[in-house]
Amino acid sequence: MSKSLQAIRGMNDILPEQSPLWRYFEGTVAGLLDTYGYSQIRTPIVEFTELFKRSIGEVTDIVEKEMYTFEDRNGDSLTLRPEGTAACVRAVLEHGITGNGQVQKLWYIGQMFRHERPQKGRYRQFHQIGVEVFNLDGPDIDAELIMLTWRLWGLLGIQDAVKLELNSLGTSEARARYRDALVEFLSARLEQLDEDSQRRLKSNPLRILDSKDQNTQAVLVGAPKLEDYLDEESRVHFEGLKARLDAAGIPFVINTKLVRGLDYYSKTVFEWVTDKLGAQGTVCAGGRYDGLVEQMGGKPTTGVGFAMGIERLILLLETLGKVPESISRQIDVYLCAFGEQAELAGLRLSEGLRDRLPGLRLAVNAGGGSFKSQFKKADKSGALFALILGDDELAKQEIGLKPLRGQGEQQNIAWDALAEHLETAIAQA
């Protein structure tokens, strides 16, 4: 017996009843980014594997364990993008849009892919909205990105459910000094570390700081502190960021163990976290990557950005009951017509309504049917009102308007007054 066709594990369909919430969320973010002056960029979901090895780092978990990599017919190694920053940097380099210090404030949306163990809030195909800013190096732009996300949480009604965590990783030179001190300290206590941390000690020791192993965390209590190795430039930058967040009234906590999972970060790193989703608590994260463009072959170009996971934020909206009631309704009006002449008149009326009321969500019954069956479909559609057109209404050039939600009697409305009457009725519903 052949195996039934189904989606790949960890890669989910977004069904029609889920789509309105996704469109609401994506539209809210896109509208906000427009008001801040950010421009959208779209990059392919497939890139040369070398791009991610050079940007993310060859010895990271993402490159070593999680990427979907394959060889094409030309023998080139290609990878489904695991994150959006590297592709965005590649695009601005390839097209020269950051040359001569030109500022670029960009955003993107799309699918990312990582071969991880699927669980609630973590998937193998997932969606991100990300922002990247090039050629601005002050703490003011770092603050703008955080203020932008804070405003978004307000629009979504979730400010009380998220917390901002901040840290500074310093410059690459300061981080190298700290790395040496941390390795020396942990090497003397190697057997007390968990297996993952022992492996990371050689490849990516800073990642040990966010280990979930209790024994490792106990060892880290006495470890050197990153803030003690920060250079003056990074200290001034970090103080400037904190001062701006204080001025904007945005609460935050300093998390000295926040290092982020990608090698390219420097100076500012931040995460928005929630305790409402269990283990998958990070809903938005980002930071500064001033050396990445040069690392990928470009001229020295500063960069800062963030990415947010759409699935987790939608899950948070649902968990908190913050899904607007209006978006669960996909149709405002359902038109029922009985008889061939009424159907023809109904088509003309419906197109006239769409001309007069461009935002109207109007469904016209298709496939005929009795009054009872059409009215049942109208009610099931979730529409606020049914429009009823039969021989009697046709003779009088009227149409019946019947509320489907709540109280109210059917009214007969003249065709030429229908658009105005509908607009008022929907606004008051």
From Swiss-Prot:
Keyword Flavoprotein attached: no
Lineage top rank: taxon: Bacteria
Places the protein is found: Cytoplasm
Presence of the UniProt keyword Kinase in the record: no
Name of a matching Pfam family: tRNA-synt_His
InterPro entries cross-referenced by the UniProt entry: aa-tRNA-synth_II (IPR006195), aa-tRNA-synth_II/BPL/LPL (IPR045864), Anticodon-bd (IPR004154), Anticodon-bd_dom_sf (IPR036621), His-tRNA-ligase (IPR015807), HisRS-like_core (IPR041715), HisRS/HisZ (IPR004516), HisRS_anticodon (IPR033656)
Reactions listed under catalytic activity: tRNA(His) + L-histidine + ATP = L-histidyl-tRNA(His) + AMP + diphosphate + H(+)
MF terms in GO: ATP binding; histidine-tRNA ligase activity
Broad EC category: ligase
One GO BP annotation of this record: histidyl-tRNA aminoacylation
Record GO cellular component, one term: cytoplasm
Alphabetized UniProt keyword annotations: Aminoacyl-tRNA synthetase, ATP-binding, Cytoplasm, Ligase, Nucleotide-binding, Protein biosynthesis
EC number: 6.1.1.21
Family: Belongs to the class-II aminoacyl-tRNA synthetase family.
Binding partners and assembly: Homodimer.
Protein name: Histidine--tRNA ligase
Lineage of origin: Bacteria, Pseudomonadati, Pseudomonadota, Gammaproteobacteria, Pseudomonadales
